[in-house]
Every structure is written in C-alpha cells, then in structure tokens.
Amino acid sequence: MLHHVRPYGHGAFVPNRLLEVTPQFLDAALARATSLGFQFASLDQVVAHVRARGDGPPQLAVTFDDGYVDNLEHALPVLRRHGVPATVFVTPGFADRTSTLWWLDLEHAIAASPEVVVDLGTGEERLPCAGDAQRSAAFERIYWSLRSGPEARLRSTIALLAARAGIDTQATVARLCLDWAGLARLAADPLVSIGAHTMTHPMLAKHDAAVVRSEMAQSRDVIVERLGVPVRHLAYPVGDPGSAGSREFAMAAEL
C-alpha cells in the first residue's frame, strides 16, 4: 500500500515522509519482488486466487491511497515499465476539493510558524517551532494527541492552526490530488483499477454506523458515476485499529 511516488524532497522536517517513496525505489521494489518469485496481480485476481485456494507463485497486489497527482505522473510510468497492475483508492472529497489533507496541513502550519498555540483538551499550550527538532516535537505532540480523540476536534484544531499560519488548505489539495479529469486519465490505463476510499477520508471507527455506511456507499456510487468504472474494493482511511475494525469490515462486506 503506497501513497506518494515522487522525487525525493530535501528537508529535515518532513514528518509525513513515511507516506512517500521515490520512483527509483518503486522501480527497484517491483524488480526485486519479481526476482523473488512474486507474481503481480490485480486485487480481483488476488481475491479469486485466495478463494480458489490456488497454487502457483505467491501473488502481490500494488495499491495507492487517496489519488495523488504523482500517481499519474511518476508511479504509472514505472508500473507500465514492469507491466504491473495497481488499484488506486479514490476519495471523492479530494477530487472535488471539498476535503482537506489535514496531516499535511498540520505539517505546513508548524513549518510556517515560530510557535504554535494549541488547546489539546487541557488548556492552551505554547509549542516552540524555531528549529527542526522543535518542529518535530510539536508535530508529534499535536498529531498523536488529536489522533486519540474525536475526529471533529482534530479537524477543527488543525484548520485553526493552518488558518493562523496562512496556509491555504484547499490549494494543498488542488496541488497534490488529481481532479476528476486526472482520475479519468489514470483509470483509462488498462493496468489501473479504481477502488473507493470513502467520501471525506474519516477515521471510520470514530463515527456512528449511519455515517460509516454513507461514507462507504456514497464514495463507491460517486466514483462509478464520475468515472464510469466498476468499484469492487474499499480501503479504510488511516487503517489502524483505531480507525477501522470488525464493525467497519462487516459493513463493507454488506455493501
């Protein structure tokens, strides 16, 4: 499961770098997996193989979350070179520019501020951000504190920090995420299939059942309508046990 594929960006304070690899890394990883005897397959093929208890070489599926511009510009040429299929899980809110990449908004707000003032539930805290070490400490403090609480508080707190720092959060989405025309170009490639990644990229386990069901079903339906492609698979945003669990798995299976 991948997110960004793009040339390496220099800088010591890049807390979200774990979400990116370079095109050269992807190229080397695909070549290495092939040399080890893995057979690349689409998610449909992997599911069929598992259900049939198929023999043969182990299968490996490549997936990308969110629908970034670099998936089209940098990842797809590597996939074509190796003939490797992939599934891109799309969040319509990013394509529509109505949802935000809050984890990047937090990074950008801290990078642009000598100090951040934030209330994490116990009153205002002043966190210095004068150097990379202080920025990293501030990011860890804010990120994990907000991740452990209600998602509404996470999003509103980060939106406030971004606004104070002069960060245009919608411009970030427009710069990094494919719009529907770009997604159509990606989906037109025979190596690419499209999956659903919810409407707004929420941590589903933090929401009631009606919201979860709507996020899943509506994202599928909107993608089918806008791109005219089948959508048979769902990726859960964030993906840790605090964001998706047995309830979400059962609801997805029903849809």
Regions found by a protein language model. Give the residues of each.
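Catalytic alpha-helical scaffold of carbohydrate-active enzymes acting on polysaccharides/glycoconjugates
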Residues: 1-233, 240-255
